[in-house]
From Swiss-Prot:
Pathway: Cofactor biosynthesis; coenzyme A biosynthesis; CoA from (R)-pantothenate: step 1/5. One of its GO terms (molecular function) is ATP binding. ATP binds at G101, S102, V103, A104, V105, G106, K107, S108. One of its GO terms (cellular component) is cytoplasm. This is Pantothenate kinase. It comes from Psychromonas ingrahamii (strain DSM 17664 / CCUG 51855 / 37).
Length: 322
């Protein structure tokens, strides 16, 4: 049975640009889409600090994958109309899905889930995932510019390279390469590249995918990554939750990845837990929290869809642009 949601049921403010759906109402929009992921698949998709459940995928991500599939098929039909008009066959350009949000909100997990589910739809089996972390400037350059403490802020990215990359995707270029960032070494891997070959969909995940000229009216750059994004998602949560999740993740890294002698933050693994908590809170207060309020959250209302998370990392409401 098909579930029909009217605009009146969905909207929560007549003057708002979004329709609001509580979790259960959104889950009803799944429309019999089958779950193709197993428990093992979910474990591989989980972030460092999330308890991703099958129910979360069923309630939130299956309806979202259905919506995205409809959008992608609509674009493909437009390409067919174009080809009929031109009386020629042209290659379809990839559909770009942008995923933005704060550090520690779970953007990467959302991106990996969508990549896994969307690749099972027959209309678009080739789904690539790219993180904008790969377009951070190398540490040596950040040090030379005296902005190492601003890593993750707009000025720490090679914005021209990132825009050239997404422009190449939208130009239909068959083989495209992207730099790879290592969270272990906290730097770009100089000898490694991510290669994209004729993807149907590209999921672009990062802090800065929704930034636009409206966020930087005095900036000389007039082209932004968001200009190339077909559908955008913002993963949101209250600031105090984000700080809590960041500290929890930091402590897990301290006992995990940071213990590797090659890790940039290896010294943190030797600290007492109370000291590690103090340092992680300081990093949040002076860097990540500031970046969130100044550069990330102001882009939220540009998203086509907002996923709002509650205390347990589970999405409790969805906002869909009208």
């Amino acid at each position: 049975m098909k579930i029909k949601i009217t605009a009146e049921e969905g909207q929560y403010n007549a003057h708002d640009a979004y329709m609001h759906f509580e979790r259960q109402k959104w889950a009803e929009l799944r429309d019999n889409v089958e779950l193709t992921l197993s428990e093992d698949d979910l474990r591989q998709l989980q972030g460092i600090n999330e308890s991703l459940s099958i129910q979360e995928v069923i309630d939130i991500y299956l309806p979202l994958s259905r919506l995205l599939n409809l959008y992608v098929k609509t674009q493909q039909r437009r390409h067919t109309v174009r080809d009929k008009f031109l009386n020629s066959k042209n290659e379809n350009v990839p559909y770009i899905i942008g995923i933005a949000g704060s550090v520690a909100v779970g953007k990467s997990t959302t991106a990996r889930i969508l990549q896994a589910i969307l690749s099972h739809w027959p209309e678009h089996p080739r789904v690539a995932l790219v993180t904008t972390d790969g377009f951070l400037r190398p540490n040596r350059e950040l040090v030379a510019r005296n902005i190492m403490h601003k890593k993750g802020f707009p000025e720490s990215f090679d914005t021209k390279a990132l825009i050239d990359f997404v422009a190449a995707i939208k130009s239909g270029k068959e083989l495209i390469s992207a730099p790879i960032y290592s969270h272990l070494t906290y730097d770009i891997l100089p000898d490694k590249k991510l290669h994209l070959e004729k993807p149907d969909i590209v999921i672009l995940e990062g802090l800065n995918v929704l930034q636009s000229a409206s966020n930087y009216p005095d900036h000389p750059q007039r082209t932004f990554v968001s200009d190339f994004v077909d559908f955008s998602i913002f993963v949101d949560a209250e600031t105090q939750l984000l700080k809590k999740w960041y500290v929890q993740r930091f402590l897990k890294f301290r006992k995990g990845a940071f213990t590797d002698p090659k890790a940039y933050f290896h010294s943190y693994s030797q600290m007492e837990e109370t000291q590690a908590i103090d340092i992680s809170e300081k990093i949040w207060d002076e860097i990540n929290g500031v970046n969130l309020e100044e550069n990330i959250r102001p882009t939220r209302d540009r998203a086509n869809l907002i996923l709002t998370k509650a205390t347990d990392h589970q999405v409790d409401s969805v906002h869909l642009r009208k």
